[in-house]
Amino acid sequence: MLNVAQVVAQNDWQNPVVFQRNRINAHSPHHGYKTLKDALHNTNAQKRSLNGQWDFRLFEAPANVPESLLSKTLSDDESANWQPIAVPSNWQLQGHDKPIYCNVKYPFAVNPPVVPSENPTGCYRTTFNVTKDELKQRNHIVFEGVNSAFHLWCNGEYVGYSQDSRLPAEFDLSGYLVEGENRLAVMVIRWSDGSYLEDQDMWWLSGIFRDVNLVTKPQHHIQDVFVTPSLGACITY
């Protein structure tokens, strides 16, 4: 288990060798349904949206994030510093930090893979419920888009890390969940070494900016679907 201080010490967001921890490998984005009727009506009871109002607090740098991010409850003084934020959204257009537009220049000094030590860090907290029957299955959480890197905890236990702002990040929560209420904590870092690859004529906006879903799957399920083509006899090269 890694706490906040330990993930800050690892400094994964400036390590070009590390771009994920415990993230499930990318796979085809197919959907599973319990019955043919559900499939025909596109009714997916196995996929639950976690979008909505989350608790949010912005810090000037990862090193400033307190261990209380992982606490089950916050003190009255700490709670006063947290505000509701819409997920999905970006924090700059929710009244936190400033958006930056760049064409060909970077928004920080160029020294890859180093990014500024004053690196705005958005912390998110939310809760959701899980039933006894759901605990018997595999429960994956899918972040469809987070800019630019993030660490994830569930019920105070470290789950993993991901960067790559425009691709989904999926983690298996099965070993971390309990029956009843569960809590998530997410630490989003604005700048990472991946930011060097993502800069070109764009607005820099940060946070959990795409959907978050909890996907419940049978213990045995189809994880990936792919096609391996072959050349016909009439094709030469």
Residue spans for each PLM region:
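Short Gly/aromatic-enriched secondary-structure transition segments
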Residues: 65-87
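Accessory beta-strand-rich segments of carbohydrate-active enzymes
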Residues: 6-24, 29-32, 36-41, 55-61, ...
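Generic detector of ordered secondary-structure context
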Residues: 46-49, 74, 120, 204
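N-terminal glycine-rich cofactor-binding segment
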Residues: 99-113
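Terminal leader/tail segments of proteins
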Residues: 2-3
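Mature N-terminal segment immediately following signal peptide/propeptide cleavage
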Residues: 45-57
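Contiguous beta-strand segments within globular domains
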Residues: 229-237
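Beta-propeller folds
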Residues: 36, 48, 62-63, 71, ...
